[in-house]
Amino acid sequence: MIVEERLTTYLHSLESADIPVLDEIEQEALADMVPIIRKETKSFLKVMLEIKRPVKILEIGTAVGFSAILMGKYSPEECHITTIENYEKRIPIARANFARAGMEQKITLLEGD
């Protein structure tokens, strides 16, 4: 990825501590070699959610649900997230992670293409 180092440093400076369940899911995903968003992407998403305050979000590619949970935690209460996953092995893991994070009502997972 080509990103100016100053921008990456700035985005990392915005990073605040995540909620414990996100840290746990991140560690599990990394241990299982499941791709999740990078730290600077997390920081950027948090800033964009604060600025835009969306009421609907569509995510293509759920994986284990890490980014959907992140967006759910940092978006307005009335925001609803729809995420789509077609890899059958990850769907139950994502659903379990949504439950762990208390996000079952805020996040809808659609299975398939």
Name the predicted role of every residue range:
Residues 1-113:
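A short alpha-helical cap/connector motif
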